[in-house]
């Protein structure tokens, strides 16, 4: 890695929020705020009405009214769930609900409450020892950005900041409203770094780079240099939809490779992903800083991809036990469903009677385990078995180790050899969910597995009278 990862990242569980769809603050409704949207060409919709795809992508102009005030009001919920880092999709001035088409990076959108709401949210989170990560969209801007409007008029100061041709311009995925910036131009580089530094000075804890693959390794590096120049404890994660190795100029990336492997495994499309997980662990220098996510604002929701709750729990177990930072997309913890964008961006459900309470409690337990267990926070990854998948998270002390088994198949007995000479003979391995005990015999343990089940096992010191098994290791 180019830079050491901030120390707090090892203990992090990230919660991703799409601000327009989370909660409306100050007791208001979207109707109360309608002028903020209508005067900028938006359309308002009642909370709870499912989002739908419209011709010409007109669904990006539909607003439900969520804001930063509302997010701040839900800090008790974040504590109840156990997360300690918020990642917000873009909050800067823009005329769409997703705000990936920035008009002004230095202005928090009034639709979200403006700068006052942003600073209030930041203060509330820091008072509860929570972190805030913002989304930096620097590969492109919106077509209403002042620079682009001037460039379209052939202003010589701005023309070279974009890629303009005779009858068109280069834009992200050829979406005309998202003109790409020429990030190699010095004025563009200085502008991006000013934005990065501005919000670091205001107190945010890090950045997520949108379209990190489009920006390329060099731009990712010089943004991280600016971040680490400000503070070694500020974090930079990049959106890279590839195999995770080779991007160690940042602290981590959004690990879509992990997501796709896990979903294929629990859905029965393959019976073996251990080789791939082990190779990625071995080859990815910043694996502990990567975000292990199962869904996001860019994918169908987990409950839609994996409708069976037992199989879904297996995916969540892997998310919280593989090296890296678990990322929970808002509402996934209560069972929200939704297909491709915009269906995956539905409003948060706040009526607990409509929640999948069993799933919510399961998430709470997994989050608590991930944040308190040394093996899961920083242990090495040692593959024990490929089908069903079993691995060891090996910590400095053997009693801190964690063994994970995930079986999406039929009932069976798994015989595991544990490659740690300090796991002593007769050591009890305790299932942290069921409380069952299984004893190690000569470095081997036999584990009965139900169909579509998992085990998370912790070694326990054996005491017999005054005798202690782990007195010298």
Curated annotation (Swiss-Prot):
Q: How does this protein's activity depend on the pH of its environment?
A: Optimum pH is 6.5 with beta-cyclodextrin as substrate.
Site (Transition state stabilizer) residue list: 298
The entry summarizes how activity is regulated as: Mn(2+), Co(2+), Zn(2+), Fe(2+), Mg(2+), and Ca(2+) inhibit the hydrolysis activity of the enzyme whereas EGTA and EDTA do not affect the activity.
List the keywords (alphabetical): Carbohydrate metabolism, Glycosidase, Hydrolase
* Disulfide linkage: none
Q: Which GO terms describe its biological process?
A: carbohydrate metabolic process
Temperature section of the record: Optimum temperature is 85 degrees Celsius with beta-cyclodextrin as substrate. Retains 80% of its activity at 90 degrees Celsius. The half-lives of the enzyme examined at 80, 85, and 90 degrees Celsius are 147, 108, and 23 minutes, respectively.
- Gene3D superfamilies, from UniProt? Glycosidases, Golgi alpha-mannosidase II, Oligo-1,6-glucosidase, Domain 2
Under the GO molecular function aspect, what terms does this record hold? cyclomaltodextrinase activity
Question: What top-tier enzyme class does this entry carry?
Answer: hydrolase
Q: State the EC number(s).
A: 3.2.1.54
Write down the chemical reaction(s) this protein catalyses. cyclomaltodextrin + H2O = linear maltodextrin
A Pfam family annotated for this chain is Alpha-amylase
To which protein family does this belong? Belongs to the glycosyl hydrolase 13 family.
Described purpose of this protein according to its UniProt entry: Is able to hydrolyze various linear maltooligosaccharides (maltotriose to maltoheptaose) and cyclomaltodextrins (CDs), to mainly glucose and maltose, by liberating glucose from the reducing end of the molecules. Shows a very weak activity on starch. Can neither hydrolyze maltose nor degrade pullulan, but rapidly hydrolyzes acarbose, a strong amylase and glucosidase inhibitor, to acarviosine and glucose.
Name used for this protein in its record: Cyclomaltodextrinase
Q: Lineage from the top down?
A: Bacteria, Thermotogati, Thermotogota, Thermotogae, Thermotogales
Name of the coding gene? aglB
